[in-house]
Amino acid sequence: MFLNNEIKNNIFTALCVLFGLAGVGFLLIIICSLIYKGILGLSPGIFTLPTAFGGLANAILGQIILVFMASVFGLFIGSFAGIYISEYSKNKAVKNGLICVIEILLSTPSIIVGVFIYAIFVSTFGSYSGIAGSLALGFIMLCVVAKTFFEALGSVDPKLKEASYALGASKRQVIMSVMMANAKPALITGVILGVARIAGESAPLLFTNANNDFFSFDIFSSLPSLSVSIYEFSLSSDEALRNAAWSGALLLLIMVLGANIITKIIFLKRK
């Protein structure tokens, strides 16, 4: 017996709702568990003591430094790469090749990037450093930013470009004042996704920056890292350190979510 279109549509809708609720449900379970266990592990020492004494104060500062340096590198190189692919690469084979490379790099495990930077940078200079760690994170971010830029710029209505050129605007003016202005929401979202992607990475930092259990602002040596400290604390047999790992994960979530919200608010005000 064949099902009519209405029954098929109802079945399909029910399956979509079911799997959608399942996905959201699992996400809510993870977030609620993180909030519950993270709050239980919070204490004044988390924000005042270094990781050597069971706190995360140095790791929080170190993570901010690493993510900031990586974001500068990733945003600068990634944005220019995306603009070049979208607007300056006229050879179709070269353009498709660059897009393919970016897609492959996006799907590459982050630990591979860490091993690559270790082989090129760390082994050459003979020591772990914050610069090496930020390069690894920045390399991951630039792929996200580059893809976002060439896709966002490619989605701008070609008639806007043609009208701008007809008015005598230069290529730089068209890209900066017309195309990027119209693609701004997508570009901002891409940058936020890039920062969120690297904020919780620990695997590449294990090979490039390692970790530091004390306060340090020397980017030429190992910087403390919140994501690596969470990983190390979670493997500890000390229950207090495992609780601190949950608190660190909660703080990392709040940092990423806070950066996202602040960016959205700034964008809405300017809009």
Spans of model-derived segments:
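A structural signal for multi-pass alpha-helical bundles of membrane permease subunits
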Residues: 27-39, 117-124
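Generic hydrophobic transmembrane alpha-helix motif, especially the helices
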Residues: 103-138
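C-terminal transmembrane helix and the adjacent membrane-cytosol boundary/short C-terminal tail
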Residues: 6-12, 85, 150-154, 158, ...
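Hydrophobic positions within alpha-helical transmembrane segments of bacterial inner-membrane proteins
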Residues: 25, 63, 67, 71-83, ...
